């Protein structure tokens, strides 16, 4: 629950009775191990006098060989059964969305037996020369500068984004890619980002659990390789004031075992109705649980970045583009109840059937939206660069799964009352569109007008993390996690305590570092300079 990787190395060394040793290995060594659970963040679940915890192999994530060590991805639970990691709730959420989405897919294709959540992350970071980095106590201790002066040339010329990559940086990037490919991380894209010294990597999209693991491993690789090139990789969300910070866009979609992306429009009205079903239900989930999405991206570092004209605001909204908005507006105008055959045909041909044409030419990109539809996926843009993707993916898959369950129950009730399947789907979708309309926003998320409009719409604007963490322990959140079997009340409250404690400890470290720098670096130099000025004044007086 530190948000980073943890590892324990066990050798295959086994002494023998005759004083020699052999290498001994069997599968039982991989399945379960017993580390100390009290030494990790645990939110009070484990104490020093009751410290037992267990690791268990996660066979759904790839094992890999790092140097000469076989690495087994594992979950981590307390002796009493509570999850003490980020992987366990993620796996539970992925299982829930699999079942819920598969059930809804039965309305359209009975060959669908499994639905996978996909994730493609975009990792932003800064590279700083090691000597310059180590000369700054604040960078060493906190990962960001606490004092400093803006350079004459920052990012005002807009010439760094996609610019020529410096040779030394490129050599570091190539080795990071090489080491990543050796471990099965399919890194595909590299480029300069907006701020000087800022760069980005992005891989091929993959199954969410595997992709989350790969990102955690990738951040570790970046740090190690950067050091070999006399760089330091900065993953803090805002390492330097006055220029852009770093984020980690999470591109999310759902795909079936038959190879269909459920968030990609099809070539027929039937396939487009399936697309609309998952598209609209995702927006409804974001509307109903926007506060939890805000909590999922909260951190001390991300507080410096959200809403600062470089990242999405702290108000959770969804951008879908003007053309898809018009499609939803048409569906909203439907009369309730059964539709005539003529009306249904017109709807399928003139509204639902034209979606591929609309998306081909009219899907724009709104960089100010925290949750944007980009043609065949949703892009969750507010995740911090140093964060694990597990938090955001757990919440997103959980809320979508819960909404799909509600939607299916509503449709089944309408069908049981004698309504045809298509009529029931359209009626249920209309209800979702109306209920979630306020969370859709097409304008400038950086503007003050949006803050005023969001307040009128009843959307929360929570600019700081401590208050955002409170959304985890509301009665509604507790019920959501419990009824879907993702986290029980004890596990949820433990995470809340850990997040709050981590936030305050980071602020405390920054405060102490700032105090040390002022007392031992800034003030002595200022006094020395003051003394020099005084001496100069006295000498000038003597000359006069």
Label each region the model flagged.
Residues 1-235, 244-250, 254-497:
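Glycine-rich, acidic/polar active-site loops that bind/position phosphate-bearing ligands
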Residues 237-239:
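Short, well-ordered turn and helix-capping elements at secondary-structure junctions
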Residues 500-544:
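Substrate-recognition/cap regions that form aromatic- and gly/pro-loop-enriched pockets
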């Amino acid at each position: 629950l530190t948000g980073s990787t943890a590892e324990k190395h066990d050798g295959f060394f086994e002494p023998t009775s005759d004083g020699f040793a052999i290498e001994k290995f069997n599968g039982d060594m991989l399945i379960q191990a017993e580390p100390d659970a009290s030494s990790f963040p645990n939110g009070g679940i484990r104490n020093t006098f009751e410290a037992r915890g267990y690791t268990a192999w996660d066979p759904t994530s790839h094992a890999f060989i790092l140097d000469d060590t076989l690495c087994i991805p594992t979950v981590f639970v307390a002796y009493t059964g509570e999850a003490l990691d980020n992987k366990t709730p993620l796996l539970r959420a992925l299982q829930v969305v699999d079942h819920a989405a598969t059930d809804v897919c039965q309305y359209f294709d009975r060959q669908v037996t499994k639905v996978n959540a996909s994730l493609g992350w975009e990792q932003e970071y800064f590279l700083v020369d090691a000597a310059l980095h180590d000369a700054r106590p604040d960078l060493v201790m906190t990962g960001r500068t606490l004092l400093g002066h803006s350079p004459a040339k920052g990012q005002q010329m807009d010439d760094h984004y996609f610019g020529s990559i410096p040779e030394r940086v490129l050599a570091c990037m190539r080795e990071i890619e090489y080491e990543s490919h050796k471990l099965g991380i399919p890194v595909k894209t590299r480029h300069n980002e907006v701020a000087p010294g800022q760069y980005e990597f992005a891989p091929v999209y993959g199954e969410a659990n595997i992709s989350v693991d790969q990102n955690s491993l990738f951040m570790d690789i970046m740090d190690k390789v950067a050091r070999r090139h006399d760089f330091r990789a900065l993953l803090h969300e805002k390492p330097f004031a006055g220029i852009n910070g770093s984020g980690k866009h999470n591109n999310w979609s759902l795909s079936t075992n038959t190879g269909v992306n459920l968030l990609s429009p099809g070539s027929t009205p039937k396939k487009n109705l399936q697309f609309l079903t998952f598209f609209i239900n995702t927006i409804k989930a974001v509307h109903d649980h926007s506060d939890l999405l805000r909590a999922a991206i909260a951190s001390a570092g991300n507080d410096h970045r959200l809403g600062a004209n470089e990242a999405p605001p702290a108000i959770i909204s969804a951008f879908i583009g003007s053309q898809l908005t018009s499609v939803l507006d048409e569906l909203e105008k439907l009369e309730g109840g059964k539709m005539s055959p003529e009306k249904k045909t017109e709807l399928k041909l003139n509204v639902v059937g034209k979606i591929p044409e609309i998306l081909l030419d009219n899907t724009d990109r709104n960089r100010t939206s925290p949750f944007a539809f980009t043609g065949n996926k949703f892009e969750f843009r507010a995740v911090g660069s140093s964060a694990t993707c597990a938090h955001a993916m757990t919440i997103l898959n959980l809320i979508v799964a819960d909404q799909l369950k509600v939607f299916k129950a509503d449709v089944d009730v309408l069908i049981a009352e004698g309504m045809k399947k298509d009529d029931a789907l359209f009626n249920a979708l209309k209800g979702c569109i109306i209920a979630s309309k306020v969370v859709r926003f097409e304008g400038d998320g950086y503007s003050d007008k949006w803050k005023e409009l969001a307040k009128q719409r009843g959307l929360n604007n929570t600019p700081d993390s401590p208050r955002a963490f409170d959304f985890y322990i509301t009665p509604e959140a507790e019920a959501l996690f419990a009824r879907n079997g993702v986290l029980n009340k004890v596990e949820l409250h433990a995470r809340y305590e850990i997040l709050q404690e981590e936030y305050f400890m980071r602020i405390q470290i920054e405060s102490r570092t700032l105090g040390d720098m002022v007392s031992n670096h800034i003030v002595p130099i200022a006094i020395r300079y003051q003394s020099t000025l005084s001496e100069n004044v006295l000498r000038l007086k003597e000359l006069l």
